[in-house]
C-alpha cells in the first residue's frame, strides 16, 4: 500500500503555491492578492477547512474576485479610487466569519477601470460581467432575481445623467450594489445587495416603496403575512395599530440569494441612527409583532448579554457616511443595522441585528466576544479567538486599534444563536 508522506514546514501552503505561477499581471491586482490571500488562508485554516477547499477558494478569489477590486488602497490617495459603500473606509472588500458554523464569507463591490469616472460615474458596469462569469462558472448561481431587482433598484442611464446635471454629488455613497460569497461545502453561495439611495434621489420615490414594490414583483409565495408585518413596522403609510419606527430608522439595503428561486431568501436592511438598547429590542421584536414567535424572547435575552458585554455607548449617530481617511483611526461611532429575512419558511420576518463595533477598542471587543463564546458553548472559539485575530493583523497592536472589528451580527434560529464578525481589510 502507498505510504502517505507527512507534510513538512518546507512545503508551500495554498497561498504560496498559487502565487508561484499567478496569472495576475497588474500591480494593483498583485497587491490585492498579497494583502488578502494570506489572511484568507489563515481564517480558513482556523475554521477547519480541508486543504483541498483552501486551494479551491483561494484560487476562486485569485481568479474571479481580485480582478474586480480596482485600485489598491493607498494612504493619501483616497480620491484616486472608487469610494465603495461596502466598508467604513470605502474599500470594496470585506472578510467576515460566521463563528457559529465556522464559515468564511467575502463581500466585494465589483469595480472596473471606468468606475467613478464620467464613463461609469455610479459603478454600474462591472457587476454585470462579474455575475455573468460566476453564473457560467457555477450552475447553482441563478441570476433571475438579480435581473429583476437590478431593473427596479438601480438608476437608469437617463436617471444617471439627470443626477449628474444637478448640484455636485459627493463621491461617496454613489454605489448601487455589492456581492457576497459564502465558502461552504466545497461550493459557493452568492448574494447580491442593492443600495437604493441614488434611485431615490433620481426618482423621488421613497426607498420603502421601491423595496416593497420590487419584492411584490418577485411573486414569492407565502410571504404576504411577513411582508405586511414589516410594512406596518417600517412604512408610515401602513398601520395595524401597533408601534412603528420613527424618522431615525430608515431602509438601507435589499438583498437576495442568487440561487434557485425556491431557495432564495430576501433580506430587507434598515439603519437606526439612535443607538440604544430599547431601540435594538424594538427592532428585534418588530415593535412587539414578533412576540408570538417562540424564538423571540430567548434570542432577545442572548442579544442583551452580547450587547452588555460589548459595552457600545448609546447615542445619536449623526452621519451614516462619515468622511473617513484610510490610515487614520476613527474618532466617532456608527449606527445600528438590522435585516429581516423574508421567506416562506417563517410567518415572521426573521431579524438579524448588527452591533457596530467600529470605533471601539479591538482588544476590548476580543475579550467581550471571548466571554460570549464561552457563554453560548463555542468552547474552541473562546480558546483560540484572541490568538487567531492577532495573527490576521501581525503588524497591528490590537490594544491600541479601534477599527479592526467593524461589526458583530446576531440572529437566533432553531434554538441556536448565530454570530458573525466583520473585519476591516486594513
UniProtKB/Swiss-Prot annotation:
Family: Belongs to the tryptophan dimethylallyltransferase family.
Organism: Aspergillus sp. (strain MF297-2)
PANTHER family attached to this UniProt entry: INDOLE PRENYLTRANSFERASE TDIB-RELATED, PRENYLTRANSFERASE ASQH2-RELATED
Primary enzyme class: transferase
GO biological process: alkaloid metabolic process
Positions bound to dimethylallyl diphosphate: 105, 191, 193, 267, 269, 352, 354, 418, 422
Position of the signal peptide: none
Protein name: 6-Hydroxy-7-prenyldeoxybrevianamide E synthase notC
Top-level taxonomy: Eukaryota, Fungi, Dikarya, Ascomycota, Pezizomycotina
Binding residues for substrate: 94, 195
Keywords on record: Alkaloid metabolism, Prenyltransferase, Transferase
Enzyme Commission (EC) number: 2.5.1.-
Amino acid at each position: 500500500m502507498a505510504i502517505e508522506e507527512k507534510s513538512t514546514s518546507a512545503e508551500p501552503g495554498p497561498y504560496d503555491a498559487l502565487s508561484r505561477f499567478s496569472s495576475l499581471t497588474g500591480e494593483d491586482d498583485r497587491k490585492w492578492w498579497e494583502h488578502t490571500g494570506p489572511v484568507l488562508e489563515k481564517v480558513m485554516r482556523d475554521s477547519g477547512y480541508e486543504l483541498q477547499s483552501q486551494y479551491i477558494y483561494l484560487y476562486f478569489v485569485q481568479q474571479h474576485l481580485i480582478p474586480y477590486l480596482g485600485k489598491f488602497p493607498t494612504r493619501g490617495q483616497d480620491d484616486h479610487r472608487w469610494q465603495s459603500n461596502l466598508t467604513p473606509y470605502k474599500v470594496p472588500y470585506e472578510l467576515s466569519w460566521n463563528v457559529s458554523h465556522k464559515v468564511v464569507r467575502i463581500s466585494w463591490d465589483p469595480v472596473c477601470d471606468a468606475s467613478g469616472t464620467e464613463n461609469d460615474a455610479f459603478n454600474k458596469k462591472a457587476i454585470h460581467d462579474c455575475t455573468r462569469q460566476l453564473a457560467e462558472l457555477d450552475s447553482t448561481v441563478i441570476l433571475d432575481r438579480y435581473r429583476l431587482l437590478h431593473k427596479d433598484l438601480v438608476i437608469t442611464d437617463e436617471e444617471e445623467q439627470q443626477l449628474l446635471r444637478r448640484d455636485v454629488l459627493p463621491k461617496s455613497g454613489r454605489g448601487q450594489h455589492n456581492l457576497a460569497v459564502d465558502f461552504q461545502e466545497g461550493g459557493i453561495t452568492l448574494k447580491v445587495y442593492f443600495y437604493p439611495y441614488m434611485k431615490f434621489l433620481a426618482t423621488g420615490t421613497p426607498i420603502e416603496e421601491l423595496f416593497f414594490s420590487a419584492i411584490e414583483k418577485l411573486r414569492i409565495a407565502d410571504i404576504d403575512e411577513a411582508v405586511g408585518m414589516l410594512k406596518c413596522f417600517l412604512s408610515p403609510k401602513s398601520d395595524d395599530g401597533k408601534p412603528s419606527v420613527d424618522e431615525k430608522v430608515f431602509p438601507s439595503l435589499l438583498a437576495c440569494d442568487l440561487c434557485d428561486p425556491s431557495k432564495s431568501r430576501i433580506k430587507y436592511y434598515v439603519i437606526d441612527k439612535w443607538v440604544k438598547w430599547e431601540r435594538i429590542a424594538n427592532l428585534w421584536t418588530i415593535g412587539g409583532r414578533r412576540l408570538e414567535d417562540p424564538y423571540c424572547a430567548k434570542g432577545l435575552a442572548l442579544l442583551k448579554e452580547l450587547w452588555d458585554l460589548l459595552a457600545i455607548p448609546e447615542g445619536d449617530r449623526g452621519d451614516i457616511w462619515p468622511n473617513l481617511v484610510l490610515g487614520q483611526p476613527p474618532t466617532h461611532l456608527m449606527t445600528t443595522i438590522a435585516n429581516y429575512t423574508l421567506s416562506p419558511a417563517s410567518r415572521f420576518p426573521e431579524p438579524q441585528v448588527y452591533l457596530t463595533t467600529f470605533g471601539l477598542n479591538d482588544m476590548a471587543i476580543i475579550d467581550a466576544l471571548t466571554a460570549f463564546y464561552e457563554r453560548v458553548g463555542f468552547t474552541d472559539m473562546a480558546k483560540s479567538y484572541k490568538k487567531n485575530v492577532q495573527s490576521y493583523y501581525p503588524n497591528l497592536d490590537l490594544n491600541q486599534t479601534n477599527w479592526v472589528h467593524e461589526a458583530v451580527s446576531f440572529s437566533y434560529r432553531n434554538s441556536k444563536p448565530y454570530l458573525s464578525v466583520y473585519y476591516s481589510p486594513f
